[in-house]
Amino acid sequence: MASHSSVSYRSVRTGGTSAMIGSSGYGGSSSSRAMGLGMGAAGLSMGGGSFRVGSAGIGGMGISSGIGGMGISSRAGGMSAYGGAASGGAGGFVSGGVPMLGYGGGAGGFIGGVSPGIMASPAFTAGRAITSAGMSGVVGTLGPAGGMVPSLVSRDEVKNILGTLNQRLASYVDKVRQLTIENETMEEELKNLTGGVPMSPDSTVNLENVETQVTEMLTEVSNLTLERVRLEIDVDHLRATADEIKSKYEFELGVRMQLETDIANMKRDLEAANDMRVDLDSKFNFLTEELTFQRKTQMEELNTLKQQFGRLGPVQTSVIELDNVKSVNLTDALNVMREEYQQVVTKNVQEAETYCKMQIDQIQGISTQTTEQISILDKEINTLEKELQPLNVEYQRLLTTYQTLGDRLTDLQNRESIDLVQFQNTYTRYEQEIEGNQVDLQRQLVTYQQLLDVKTALDAEIATYKKLLEGQELMVRTAMADDFAHATVVRSGTLGGASSSSVGYGASSTTLGAISGGYSTGGGASYSAGAGGASYSAGAGGASYGVGGGYSGGSSAMMEGSSSGGHSMYSSSSMKRSSSKSASASAGGYGTSGHDSTIILQQ
């Protein structure tokens, strides 16, 4: 019966994460009654690690005596195997509440069992023993296995697992799409900031010189800030001095205004005193003239009376004699009248003179007081004028100082404005230079990171090829051990993904299976080989697991994946043993950063 082998992969490129879904083929057999059937599984890889869900198959029916292959009778049910590996020593996977072991590197992975009541094959026992050793090396001689294994996982559980993985994959894809959109937005913003300048390295820019320039600029900015503070302090001092001088000027101006007011009042008093003096002088002159006129009038009247009485006396002399006892002496009467009149005139003259003297003395006293007051006022005016002269000089000096300080303050303000504009321009220019230097530095960092990624990818690819060559040598050495009934496997663990090996056991008593070996790194290369009648292949570090069926012989598969080199390569080569047909194989890929995976399968 012809063997059939098919492997299908779907690669999803999602901006730095690659996910693969693999399915197993149909197992072959060496007789017409043996057939293997593989069920599709899924594989997922993301970031720097890997996670695989290997193929699940239902083995064919063996015709051997119960030792080889699946160790069951001709009518026994098949088996299923689930394998996987998580790079970096991740934990196992639990499906349907049943913990599964695996062949993978590190402590991760899982493997399912066969259906209840089926004896585990030596290859399965060896794979489980190797897996349980974790990252440690295993040295041992394998023999027939015994004991029971966990029950077969049902189709519903497989569907649930695949549904869960598909949901996780969809969530990862959505997240990656969102991150892609955000990345495009950030690229647009960066393009707007850089003005469309490509992020290419600038060999002419020296970061040390840039840092030195930035330090010098910051120092200059600090010095300018200190200078500005000093100028502000000087301006404040000048303003305080100007305010003090202004207050003094206002005080002196108030004193001057008060003095001018007092002088004006004194001038008004002096004018009033002068007017009073003139009035009193005029009154004095009027009274003097009136006194003179009264004297003159009285003298004229007196002279007239004297003339009258004197003319009558000598001219008319008559003696009248009366014969009366009571005769009247007219001369005596006239003399008496004259004396009385003279007394009255004298009294009036004296009263008039006394009154005039009193008025004159009063006027003279008032005039003297006024004169004294005028003299005092003149002295005070002279004193105030003398005091006002230095005040005027001080006022002129303060006014000149105020104008000078005002001009200086204006000059300082203009200079400060000019310096501030220059400082702002310098600061803006320095900020632009710093931003440009930051953009150049970011561009150089991006270029450096790209080169570092390329270097890491190349190193990982070189390491992968080295391990591939080591795996091929191991396959050649193990192929020479087909005449032995038992196989000894020695592998040592390595960091990041460790190494693992599995063996296959013969399908019959006359034909032994070839030893299958595996090797894994932390998400890097992996090799798996399956051999024997109804053996399973074991993989590590993200490899796959297949189930084969047949009478004798088998095939070996070699698979390798690289996680950091920018691509993944999977290859499979078969080694025919005896008259066997090739068994099925499936592989789960390991993702790379933004690149699709390439699958190569050879029979």
From Swiss-Prot:
Region described as Linker 12: spans on this chain: 342-362
Lineage of the organism: Eukaryota, Metazoa, Chordata, Craniata, Vertebrata
Chain spans, region Coil 2A: 363-381
Primary role: Released extracellularly into seawater and provides physical and biological defense against invasive organism by modulation of the viscoelastic properties of mucus.
Domain IF rod: 158-476
Residue numbers spanned by region Linker 2: 382-389
Region (Disordered), start-end ranges: 562-603
SMART domains tied to this protein: Filament (SM01391)
Record keywords: Coiled coil, Intermediate filament, Secreted
Record region (Tail): 511-603
Keyword check for Coiled coil: yes
Family: Belongs to the intermediate filament family.
Cellular location(s): Secreted, Extracellular space
Organism: Eptatretus stoutii (Pacific hagfish)
Record-given protein name: Thread biopolymer filament subunit gamma
Annotated stretches, region: Head: 1-191
Start and end residues of each stretch annotated as Coil 2B: 390-510
